[in-house]
Amino acid sequence: MRRAAVPLSTAVLGALVFLAWMRPSVLPPGNVGWLLAGEDRGQSALGLAAYLRAGGPWPALRQPLLAAPEGMALLFTDSIPLLGLLLKPFAPLLPVGGQYIGLWYLACTLLHAAFAAALVRRHAPDALAAWCGAALLTLMPALFNRYGHASLCAQWLLLWALWIFIEPRRARDPGWWAAVLGVAALVHSYLLLMVLAFWSGALLERLASRRERGRALLGVAALVPAALIMAAHGAFGGPYAATHTYGAFPAALDAWWNPANPDFTALLPSSPMGTEGRGFEGLQYFGAGLLALVLLLAFRTATGRLEAEPRAELRRLLWLAPSFLLFALVAIGPAPLWRGEPLFALHLPARLTDALDPVRAAGRLLWPATYTIAFAAVVAAASSARATLLLGGALALQVVDIAPMLAAVRHQSRRADDPRLFTRTADPRWTELVTRAGAVQFEPARPFVDLAVMEEVAWRAVVACRPVRYFYASREALATRARIDADSRAFAAGRLDPARLYVLLGDRPAPPALAGRVRVINGVRFIPPSRPAPPPRCASSPPTAP
């Protein structure tokens, strides 16, 4: 009975954290409308839906409907390839046009709590102390802040990698590293980089030992599965277009104690929110409870009062310092921020910023250090004479401090309580227009003109198995961009494909030659197809009307 109580209490923790973070109405696969609100999680849902609707044979990782005719990898629509691979064999049995992002959020909190408990359990004197420690490692603002990017909510991968690293026997086993690296490669490239930081720390430790040096080199084989998966994504192909935005999304020098969003803390002062990159991508805030434990750890270490057992284990974490320092340099970027303001700015060569474009949201790269420091602080507290009191008090402080953040983030999922599928394109004539078209083309072919309309129309296209000529991607192949630009030039010149539905985003006027053909439904302008398209060809079940 006692043995069963541990996983049960961990599952309860994960479920409670989910309910504090999200509304339960995000869970049903048939509730889709909340994802089509012009946010990045709509991109994730659309890529996955397109893959289940028309993706190649399992275990292919591409979908052909978005950015057609080339299509794109699930990785580049942030659509959680792992989820696609798990669901694809059942695609003929699943309802067309379902969403699984809500269930993914729940899975992430459950797995996060499980790995947090595994990390803390053997250091805690009793079950209550272990639960409080696991709760502290789960109530991480960096996790809750990623509500808009579902794939990046898999921060349990960092805890899994830390769990492997912290036990020397596991850290020497390439099989464990191959598993976590392979799964990370099936979730998100940033998370793969972060897991590599832990792997490189374990490798460095073994290389420093003469006895382990020869066998350590064999550990490089752990990279093979992840490398093959990334090759399957097309990550080594391209070339890909650069956004020239490295440095726009940094982590600040004071990010651990300054959330840069006054709405996210009840107890500590915060600088103004500022730019999205500073307050969103760069958020590394510990929360008051964890910050108190970090300060306590620093004090006990400096004064020699840290117990011998955790001190010896935590000393191994220093092998992670080289990779963490490198990540910190990239995360802080060329214009270090303090209290929301740059201290100075360095001019980087264009070649360097383009090379760093794959990690342009660099502020995220501080997560491994954030989690590792939090873990060290929790372990040190768990090993003290007053462990339960310390961890319980820190947990209470953490909950009080980040309660405003949880409320603000949970409010972002309020649209899930509205059963409507479409709000911007509610007229059912849109379904007929999309179904009759051979393809959908958005003009201008840019994501942030009216992303909500783009997502709603694209969702109809995916359900109807109709290709979409342009769609928002995290990385865009130069060949695809050249074809999209050619589409736009033809449209600007008044040359239309008669089987294509043209949706005009924003308020840019249509080309003079086409002005007379523009129609409006729900305030959205479009040019309908003048010739019906052939029947769609999709691998999964027949289309159903949304």
Regions found by a protein language model. Give the residues of each.
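Start-transfer (signal-anchor) and selected internal transmembrane alpha helices
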Residues: M1-V32, L217-A221, L306-S323
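Membrane-interface coil-to-helix junctions
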Residues: V17-L111, M140, F144, A260-P262
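Membrane-interface helix-loop junctions at the exits of transmembrane helices
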Residues: A20-S25, G133, L139-Y147, M230-G238, ...
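Periplasmic/ER-lumenal interhelical loops and adjacent helix-loop junctions
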Residues: G38-E39, A226-T301
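Membrane-interface micro-motifs in multi-pass membrane enzymes
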Residues: L75-I80, Q99-T109, L136-W160, L186-Y190, ...
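Membrane-embedded helix bundles of polyisoprenyl
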Residues: L106-H123, L128-P168, D173-R206, V220-I229, ...
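Signature aromatic-anchored transmembrane alpha helix within multi-pass, membrane-resident enzymes
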Residues: G219-L223, L325, F375, A381-V409
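Extracytoplasmic
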Residues: I402-P546
